[in-house]
Swiss-Prot record:
Protein name: Succinyl-diaminopimelate desuccinylase
Binding site for Zn(2+) 2: D99, E134, H348
Stated role: Catalyzes the hydrolysis of N-succinyl-L,L-diaminopimelic acid (SDAP), forming succinate and LL-2,6-diaminopimelate (DAP), an intermediate involved in the bacterial biosynthesis of lysine and meso-diaminopimelic acid, an essential component of bacterial cell walls.
GO biological process, one term: L-arginine biosynthetic process
Residues forming the catalytic site: D68, E133 (proton acceptor)
Pfam family, one: M20_dimer
Stored NCBIfam families: dapE_proteo, PRK13009.1
EC number annotated for this UniProt entry: 3.5.1.18
Cofactor binding remark: Binds 2 Zn(2+) or Co(2+) ions per subunit.
Pathway: Amino-acid biosynthesis; L-lysine biosynthesis via DAP pathway; LL-2,6-diaminopimelate from (S)-tetrahydrodipicolinate (succinylase route): step 3/3
PROSITE patterns associated with the record: ARGE_DAPE_CPG2_2 (PS00759)
């Protein structure tokens, strides 16, 4: 059994449902200590965070991952118990196999092999793991990055092991992500009888013209790497349930996924302007989950594309699609950030799995990326 598969199995059998770590990071820290890494625990609010580093010189290359997983759901929906790693028909089954304990195992094994071959490698290597990626993502990577920034630490390259592949390993990798901005809007009216609308103020009617404009607005045109910003209503609630009562208030939740062409502050100002222009009496609270980031060129891009091409025979597509990841906390630091991992077809589903051959190839790709960036000059 390979080092990658063995470690992946050991991680999967630990039921680390977010924000629990269940000993996963201790296992990794022990493995990395044997390879000359120092470990620092930056835990906060019940979240386990490991920062392990070898070397102090620049450039600093960081593998970023998470050890927490989403709940398994009904065990009856699984072919095998979700926290009992099973290899069947060439695939490793278990919660976290693809998202993202398989990637963690692959990059730890790659680091071990690289350090053994190049004990005097250039720069420094770090591994950052958190148990708060699948949850609120407040006390995990975000907190660690803030701590490192306060120390003046600079990360040059960051590879996030998120499952980026679509149909085959390495066919696609992320070079950026859109930002996410959520608004919690309360439209204030006055409750009354539907037969006497002149004695009430219907918040639904008051908001309707503004909603039409919000939905029709072109926020930006995107660019070569990012689609235009999208505005989506996710929840609307109003009324008492009775058919003869005009509601006194309406709650609306909306989200914008936005490109670097526009800022969160600009979007907030434009939305407030629309609401005021339509005379909507409202209260609006914002939650900014993360700014967009993009790595459009650089040594990390070159290393990833060369390594993937060498092991798959095809250059990976660059993509910025999908939801947010912890890469959003690394992007603003100035680091070159990419996401590269296994297939995402079964993530968060029953019978989550990853091909064992893909895990082995992923370890080799990660190893080659380190070779390109940190191998000592001959």
């Amino acid at each position: 059994m390979s080092a990658t598969l063995e470690l992946a199995r050991e991680l999967i059998q630990r039921p680390s449902v977010t924000p629990e770590d269940a000993g996963c990071q201790t296992l990794v820290a022990e493995r990395l200590a044997a390879a000359g890494f120092g470990a620092e625990w930056l835990n906060a609010a019940g979240v386990t965070n490991l920062w392990a580093q070898r070397g102090t010189e620049r450039p600093l290359f960081c593998f970023l991952g998470h050890t927490d997983v989403v709940p398994s759901g009904p065990e009856s929906a699984w072919q095998h118990p979700p926290f009992q790693p099973i290899v069947e028909n060439g695939c490793l089954y278990g919660r976290g196999a693809a998202d993202m304990k398989g990637s963690v195992a692959a990059f730890v094994a790659a680091v071990e092999r690289f350090v053994a071959r190049h004990p005097d490698h250039a720069g420094a290597i770090a591994v950052l793991l958190t148990s708060d990626e699948e949850g609120p993502a407040v006390d995990g990577t975000r907190r660690v990055v803030e701590t490192l920034a306060a120390r003046g630490a600079a990360i040059d390259y960051c590879l996030v092991g998120e499952p980026s592949s679509q149909a085959r390993l390495g066919d696609e990798y992320k070079v950026g992500r859109r930002g996410s901005l959520t608004g919690h809007l309360t439209v204030h009216g006055e409750q009354g009888h539907v037969a006497y609308p002149h004695q009430a103020d219907n918040p639904i009617h008051a908001f309707a013209p503004a909603l039409q404009e919000l939905v029709a607005t072109e926020w930006d045109q995107g660019d070569a790497d990012f689609p235009p910003t999208s505005f989506q209503i996710s929840n609307i609630q109003a009324g008492t349930g009775a058919d003869n009562v005009i509601p006194g208030a309406m709650e609306v939740v909306f989200n914008l996924r936005y490109a670097p062409a526009v800022s969160a502050e600009e979007l907030q100002e434009r939305i407030e302007s629309i609401l005021h222009r339509h005379g909507v009496h409202h209260t609006l609270h914002w939650r900014h989950s993360g700014a967009p980031f993009a790595t459009r060129e650089g040594a990390l891009i070159d290393a990833v594309e060369q390594a993937v091409t060498a092991h798959t025979g095809q250059c990976p597509r660059r993509s910025t699609s999908g939801g947010t990841s912890d890469g959003r906390f690394m992007g603003p630091t100035g680091a070159q950030v990419v996401e590269l991992g296994p297939l995402n077809a079964t993530i968060h589903k029953a019978n989550e799995h990853v091909a064992v051959a893909d895990l082995e190839a992923l370890e080799a790709i990660y190893f080659d990326i380190l070779q390109h960036l940190l191998a000592p000059a001959d």
